């Protein structure tokens, strides 16, 4: 039986500071919102909140990977069942859409190309740009929606009439790093109901209203890999090229199965041990020599070779869709959940940018994204080409 709403109470935490950028989102019974229903607790509660706010709410489950390929990497069938159960509980219609073709063309092929080139990409960022905030948005607009909504822990703001992407108020769950490539026009058409909440509050609301997803484990990793070993998945698409593992001094100490299976700062899975010449301290990846197909390692997670003061990045996406004025002093993240790092951005003659950090950064990884902030505002970001010291 669909829920009958009385009053939805959301506890405001002391840590949830107010922002002068925030846009008010009054209830509007004439506005139709389609929520991206993933089968998780965040999108479930997003739909719940929007219904309480008076919107006309419908859901959409996106199939972005063909789980019928015989590998069963995805949990799409279970997720769809959960999304349907929540939709039934809320009394809303659930649409389904197959974006597997768009995902393959615009996300997965790029993912493979980056790994083949020896870099470590983040497909979730491209998925947000090309699928969740493009294909999904276009699909929803064709259904005469006024907005889409997602369960991302970010907020929508405004300054001088321009949409802004803000960090989520729960610092431990903020997902703005993954949404930096989404433009202002898409942000203006999107609602982020759980961006104002802490994760514990989201789960409390889901349990209070009897949603099946209230204790569902958060999804981790890449959808199309799921619980399988990354190496097992990748070798189905890219041929492995084994090579030597060397120390910084050039000693050959082991063999690797392929550079694409390793990333800067990696400790696990190197297969190095029992070397009489060296201590038992763990080994870490410090560099991938693509020309020689050699993995370079060192002992000690705080070794100076793991730290860089500068990086060069390209392929930028600015939320405002206009690049800022350089030089720009701001803060940056080189990986998800990293604390904001003070830096200065300078534009190079070839259009790339050089980022100079106040403090050396550990394990800066080519192929990953560097994302820039001023206070809570996400400016945008780009793809790391190379990291170095001056």
Curated annotation (Swiss-Prot):
The active site is at 127 (nucleophile), 223 (cysteine persulfide intermediate). Its EC number is 2.8.1.13. ATP binds at residues 36-43, 62, 151. The gene is mnmA. The record marks 152, 368 as: Interaction with tRNA. Disulfide bonds join 127-223. It is found in: Cytoplasm. It holds the Pfam family tRNA_Me_trans_M. Keywords: ATP-binding, Cytoplasm, Disulfide bond, Nucleotide-binding, RNA-binding, Transferase, tRNA processing, tRNA-binding. GO terms for cellular component: cytoplasm. It catalyses: S-sulfanyl-L-cysteinyl-[protein] + uridine(34) in tRNA + AH2 + ATP = 2-thiouridine(34) in tRNA + L-cysteinyl-[protein] + A + AMP + diphosphate + H(+). This is tRNA-specific 2-thiouridylase MnmA. It comes from the Bacteria. GO terms for biological process: tRNA wobble position uridine thiolation. It comes from Marinomonas sp. (strain MWYL1). Residues 122-124 are annotated as: Interaction with target base in tRNA. InterPro entries: MnmA-like, MnmA-like_C, MnmA-like_central, MnmA-like_central_sf, Rossmann-like_a/b/a_fold.
